[in-house]
Structure formats: C-alpha cells, structure tokens
Amino acid sequence: MTATLTSLNFEHLIVTDPKILADIRNVYATTHYGPEDAEFLKTPGGQQDLDFNTFIRYNQSVRNGLPWVQRVFDMTGKTLIEIGCGTGSSTAAFAYLAKHIYSCDPKENTLPTARARLEALNLTNIDITSHAAPEFFHYCRQNYCDQADAVLFFAVLEHQTLDERIESLRQAWQILKPGGVIIVIETPSRLTYMDHHTTRLPFYSMLPMDVALRYVEHSSRGDFVGSMLKARSEPLAVQEELMIRWGRGISYHEFDLAFPDGGYTIIADGYEREMTDLFPVTFDERLLQGFVAHNGFNIPPAFLRHTLCLILRKGDGAVPAPQRTYTPHVATKLELERLRDRLDLMSIAEIRGELNRLMDRGVAFGHQSGM
C-alpha cells in the first residue's frame, strides 16, 4: 500500500537533544579517528565531517529519504536489508518504520557509532554485523531471513568494484519478495560533466582508470590526494581498489548487466520533490536529457540524474512489468527545437562571457605569453 500524503511528515524524528548528539559525536570521533587526527578534527573539514556523521545525514534520511520511499512503498512493518550502514544514520531513520532491519558494513570502525546511535534512540529492531556485500546476503539467509521486502543501498554502490556491484544487485533481487523494492539513494552517476563526489574535478568520472590514477594531484581534496599518493608505490591493483573505495560513479549499464531480462518497474526516479530538494536538477542534467531525447535513446530518466536516487519494484505477477522506456520532458519535435534554441543561446552567452573574462585577465590562447 502506498502511503498517504498526510503520513509523510517525519519532522518529529529529528534529534535535538544535545546530550544524545554529543554522545554520538564523541563515539564517532574516538572510534573513526585516532590521536594523530586531533588537529584535523579542529579544522573546518574535520568539524564538517563530525557534523555530517552526527546529525546531517540522519536528518536528510528523515526529512527526505523516509517520505520519498513511503510515498511509493509503505515500509511500515516491512523487513529491510541494508547494505553499507556506515554510522547508522539511514539505519536509525528507517528503523522507525520497518519491522526489522538486517544491516552490515565492511568497515568495523563505523559500527560503534551506528550502535551508539541506535542505543541512544532506543531502537532495538536492528541487527548489525561486519560484512561486505554480496556475502551478507548469504549470511542473512543462513541466520536471519530467506526473503525481504526491501533492500537499501544508501551511498554504497559507488564504493564497490564492478563485480561486487553487479553481484550485490543480483543477490538483492533474489532475496526480494515479489513486489519488493531495491532502494538506491545518493549514488553519483558517471554520466556527468562534474565529479562532485570524490575529486571535485570536471570530466573525472569519464576518465579510464589508468588516466584517473595519474590525474589525482589535480583534485582540490587534500585527503583524497594524500591517500592516493601514499599508495603510488603499491601494485596497480591496490591503487585501483583504493580509487574505487573512495567512490566512482555508476550508470544504467550496471543495472542492465545485473538484470539482463528486465523484470522491474522504476517507481521513483529521483525527480520527486524530496530528492530534488536534496539534489536540485542542474543545467548539465537538462543537456543530457536533451541529448537522450534528440537521439531517441531508450534510457529511463532515473539514470540521467547527476546523483542517482531510484526505487526498483520487483514484479509480482499481478501486472506485467512495462518495458523500460524514456519519456522525454520534451514531448514534441517543436518543443525539442525550442529547447535546442534555448540551449544554444545559453551556451553562446556563457562561452562569450567566459572568453571576455579570460581576455580581461590577459590570458593568451594557444600559446604562453612571450613564447
């Protein structure tokens, strides 16, 4: 049953008790970081990380994640498997609705924070273990449940290898009950001009791995650059895995590989209000939509967002799953032509403005000044 709109306000779940927040923050600071990180934690970047893992992501899960899912799939009383719980922000949020959550994370240093959060909020309907996917699905079958109503990947798929990613999606599909859902939240797309997730560099998501490894110094993220440079003397396979663990964008290709026969329906595609509030639609996305529409590619709009937030529903035999089709925002040829004209004018204006700015700064084109 889909939730009614009146049930989509979860503001009462926001944690404001300063003692609870301080306790969670302290556990995270002392278990995720060591004494050598004391100075970093005093910096704006360190404080931001503490805030993010104490309350920001939890608040986002409550205000955006819960109503977004509940709008199309009622989680009340359902069994949820969560892959990659991290510090338990999404775990705690969804625990208010689900009957039981079976959750895992391969990073043991994140689990004390998750457990402290759940204890502080008096949430007892969760089992957390230190496992990686896809192995966790086998563990669930042996120890917890044969089937689940939903599987959650919250900011997880981008940190997996290709094999892990495809097998995790397949295992999730197999353990789902008919009519169950796979929930993907906050996973960066590789089909973007800008890598906002890992390097904050343009076109980085499009680079092949060998070029990406050589180009890390250009990133403005000191922690990322330092980590990657430290591994420069390691075998190439070690460097590649480290890059993946930091996060590499994904696309519809992995879903086509995991589900070659289709069989699913996209019941939420990331253009809903809850997700656009978190991740506003960008000019780059509109360009990609226009490109797909112009060429008639059969790519669902869910995979054209710069940050993927989508819910896949497994067929239950009641209604045949429709073929995956792309319904362009531009419905007619005339509208497409008008969109093209607007994009051309916008692009020309932006390019002209940038050229003027560069010329005002005395930037030479094609060669260095004085050469």
Model-inferred region functions:
Residues A155-H159:
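Short catalytic micro-motifs in class I SAM-dependent methyltransferases
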Residues L201-H253:
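SAM-dependent methyltransferase
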Residues I166-P178:
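A short glycine-rich, Lys/Arg-flanked "PGG" loop and its adjoining helix->strand segment in the class I
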Residues A231-N356, D360:
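A C-terminal cap/extension of S-adenosyl-L-methionine-dependent methyltransferases
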Residues A95-Y96, K177, P260:
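Short conserved AdoMet
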Residues S89-A93, T110, Q160, R190-D195, ...:
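Short catalytic/ligand-binding loop motif for oxyanion handling, primarily in non-cytosolic enzymes
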Residues I183-A212:
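Conserved class I S-adenosyl-L-methionine
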Residues T2-D146, A150, F154, I166, ...:
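Conserved N-terminal segment of class I S-adenosyl-L-methionine
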